[in-house]
UniProtKB/Swiss-Prot annotation:
Compartments (UniProt record): Cytoplasm
GO CC field: cytosol
Protein name: D-ribose pyranase
Organism listed in the record: Bacillus cereus (strain 03BB102)
The protein's assembly and partners: Homodecamer.
Amino acid sequence: MKKHGVLNSEIASVLASLGHTDTIVIADCGLPIPAGVKRIDLAVEIGKPSFLDVLQVVADDMAIEKVTLAEEVINNNAEVNKEIELKLIEPAFEYVCHEQFKEHTKKAKAIIRTGEATPYANVILHAGVIF
């Protein structure tokens, strides 16, 4: 049994398979998941698990080069936006409109659906390299 890091076997497998610039999405419970993209559904009830809890665990186990967020999060969910900026200090940040964000999710290797039920609590993580 693993002692630390991501214990969820599906998430651990996706993280291990990522190459440089590949993307994964951590999403609230309302983000549409495009056909053909792997869905890892962690939601058990509204708010559980939280977006920020899942983001922290994944970020601790992943080399992240860039982060993409919907620009609407700035005005509609400032608290989550601030927490993302505090948790992910090193990667570059990119903000796009929500419609563009949803288009970008079509290229993701996987979308991790949380129980989060606050607006625009979604992030695209772009894989970096460890060297």
